[in-house]
Amino acid sequence: NFGVSNHKPMQIELLQKYVRQPLVVNQVQFSIPVSNLVANGMEVNMETPGSIDHDGSLLDYCRLHNITLQAWSPFQMPAWKGCFLGSDEYPELNQKLQVIAEKYNVSDTTIAAAWILRHPANMQIITGTASESRLKEIIAACDITLTREEWYELYLAAGHLLP
């Protein structure tokens, strides 16, 4: 078995044509603000930027082919502007993260990670940190199951649309 990073469905198909081992992982950038994988499915038939399919329906493809998506840069803003946690660019999202974090008695980092883990695609998180406490906060997300309402509230608070 092996995995790839940032591959679209047709790239995966082409690669699988020439290798014997099954491809089981695709690493992609994914966070609450950087969630085009979800947006293009939510905004189908809408005249919005999120409706544009930039990845060839990668989320659906991976789910249909039992390929695990691994989210890299799970706390990153779009355009590599840094971490969205505590950023002035996402006041509504950070406020909502704080409210939900207080409910579960965890950090906003934990809730941001739990948001990724709550998606039915059973995504995994790839993160790097030199902070033991931050790593513990991320690991704590495995014990939190956000409600659907909380998941969508965070999605909307990041500026995404629903039909």
Regions found by a protein language model. Give the residues of each.
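Beta/alpha (TIM)-barrel catalytic core signal, keyed to glycine-rich beta->alpha loops juxtaposed to Asp/Glu
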Residues: N1-P163
